[in-house]
Amino acid sequence: GQQLIIPAAGLYQPSAAESPAPPTQAGKAIVVSVSQQRIYAYENGQMIRSHLVSTGRAATPTVLGDFRVYVKYLADDMAGPGYFQPQVPYTMYFYRGYAIHGAYWHNSFGRPMSHGCVNLPVDEANWFYQWAEIGTPVRVIA
């Protein structure tokens, strides 16, 4: 018979033509597309992984621009106006209080849900956390 391979939810790999350009052709880089609600990992200009994310809602948008991972925490308590989220897993801050991290409190990836951070399923956040280093470029585009 015929063998079908069905990727895990959210792990659809866009073609190179569909994926945004990385900020560098050398080394590792991360791109987050707010309009696509998707994160991309690149090595030497080649996309190696992509997954659905949840970025900031309209009232609390994710910051756009070019940044770098400046600190990583295996888990971090996060708080802001009206919320406290303890032990947020696999947190990588890239600009002030904006981070890429795991979200154990929702499973609505693919649509804006956050207070400005880039939410990933916990297992995907683990992959990005293990792969990325301090200083890895992060580009957030509309």
Task: Put a short name on every predicted segment.
Residues G1-P20:
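Extracellular LysM carbohydrate-binding repeats and other cell-envelope/extracellular binding modules
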Residues Q2-Q3, Q13, Q25, Q36-Q37, ...:
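Residue-identity detector for glutamine
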Residues I6, S50-H51, G102, H115:
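Short capping micro-motif at the N-terminus of alpha-helices
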Residues I6, V32, V53, V69, ...:
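Hydrophobic aliphatic residue packing
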Residues A9, N44, V53, K72, ...:
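Surface loops and adjacent helix of pleckstrin homology
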Residues A16-R57:
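A structural motif detector for short, solvent-exposed N-terminal "entry" segments of globular domains
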Residues P23-Q25, R57-D66, V71-A142:
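Exported/periplasmic cell-wall-interacting domains
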